[in-house]
């Protein structure tokens, strides 16, 4: 019989691999299904840089996240490959949709509620309170405001402020993406990928809270 239900939240019609929820027989419902973030590429992830063609070559064993974050280069978002590497594949370390997994659970560990009713000199009042504890949500705002989806130059200030995100231009506006040493030094304290590397919404662990 059927053991897995593949579900789609349909919060947008252009989400990469839009089937973003799962339910399993004998398990809980509301499981968030997507990719696991692994930070971003740094200059150290690459074997070489060809200054003529301006292309980067990944080191052996480094995951190729190009299906999600464009051609690999420093600053682009990186994701974890969870499936076994196929040595017979032409690109054994490339990410595929099979590398998705359960990244969150929207079902609370427990929930409850209570109500109060009161009357006094002809006045009455009713109140009801409910609560849920220990559950995950997929924050779609984090997805849209840290990517280049729609090319609207959205900016999630706290996470991708200029002092946190990977930058390809210095403070004077000079392009540094093709100068490996300068690029690495300038971004040595970066904590976030360059948002222009992701062109479509992705269900990813970064957005699960």
Outline where the language-model segments fall:
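Outer/extracellular conduits and scaffolds centered on Gram-negative outer-membrane beta-barrels
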Residues: 1-209
